[in-house]
Amino acid sequence: MKIAFLTPEFPHPKMGSSGGIGTSICNLSRGLTQAGHQVFVLVYGQSEDVIFVENDITYYRIKNIKIKGFSRFLTQKKIEKIINLLIKNNNLDLVEAPDWTGITSRIRPNCPVVIRLNGSDTYFCHLDKRPVKFLNKFHEQRALQNADALLSVSHYTAEVTKQLFSLNRNFQIIPNSIDLEKFSNDHSIGFQENTILYFGTLIRKKGSLELPLIFNEVYKHNKQAELILIGRDASDILTKNVSTWEMMQPLFDGEAMQNVSYLGSVSYDKIKEFINTSTVCVFPTFAEALPVSWIEAMAMQKAIVASNIGWATEVIDDTVNGFLVHPQDHENYAKKIIQLLENEALRHQFGIEARKKIAQKFSIEVVAKQSADFYKKILQ
């Protein structure tokens, strides 16, 4: 098959920064290519129009058209034209796009369009308990209604999305994936005792403002505990504060703060090094669809304490391959971290079970086959 992915982001030096959507598309593209399918990646919002081929994947960098009042519509029509040329010249079979801001709301190419839920703006605003922009919800709803087929990375995201948009349609559930070969624990490096790692954007919805209160409880019990924070610092929508990190700092107890290191954004490879050497990884998030960061840490056989909200049980089995605790239950969350810091055997057990779960459910081979089988059904 010949498949195109339309995306606002992709983890490539030429494409700018990327989050979970880009990472999941990158992994799926590699899996499909390895299985013999031809993949095109169309990245809009770029600084220039460029086409290049790398590792058997054809990339289209697409520059948005900017004319006041018509930018979105004209950019959509430009994308539609590119897709139709791929159909004409390369026999493209279908195009897949994320639900985020409904980019395909006015894109009607001469092939099936698949929408994969990684979490729309409407979805995240709902989880964040804040209002969604009217136009964003309008375009997201229209894109979902117009799609020929719908996928979701988790049951939870599918059910919440159906309620929010009053959709009477079924979703095929296919999770995000990772390349297990790229995420394995390097035992030769060893790990640093008593290190607690959080990697991801510093932002309210990821539980960043709960982390200081959780770590204060850990530090009371274990004065050797160290919290390492990795990721870009985001502004806070509710308070209009330009820095979540600035908001976090006063929440730490004075002594505990001395054991906190914020390293900002680091390279993908460097993140893997920090995962490898950490004792425990923590993810006290309030809003996700299906977090790639959890899967990456589990693949590297790390003991995890994560949020118990919604999607969580589709990734982690509580007490089997990690602990699940509500982010605002600070004392209990801290107790689980302390338990793992003090119990090497339990950390090892969780790590073994975690990687086993990832291999069975979230490897690029498994997810690429599920996706390809789904695409074939659409094309029949």
Predicted regions mapped to residue ranges:
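Nucleotide-sugar donor phosphate/pyrophosphate-binding loop at the beta->alpha transition
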Residues: 77-78, 111, 123-142, 180-184
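Carbohydrate-associated surface elements
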Residues: 156, 177
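Conserved donor-binding/catalytic core segment of Leloir-type glycosyltransferases
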Residues: 189-206, 212-215, 227-230
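Nucleotide-activated donor-binding/catalytic signature segment of Leloir-type glycosyltransferases, i.e.
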Residues: 241-266
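Short alpha-helical donor nucleotide-sugar binding micro-motif in glycosyltransferases
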Residues: 265-266, 273-278
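Aromatic "clamp/platform" in nucleotide-sugar-dependent glycosyltransferases that forms part
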Residues: 286
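Short hydrophobic beta-strand element within catalytic cores of glycosyltransferases
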Residues: 303-306, 316
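Conserved acidic donor-binding segment of nucleotide-sugar-dependent glycosyltransferases
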Residues: 318-319, 323-330, 339-345
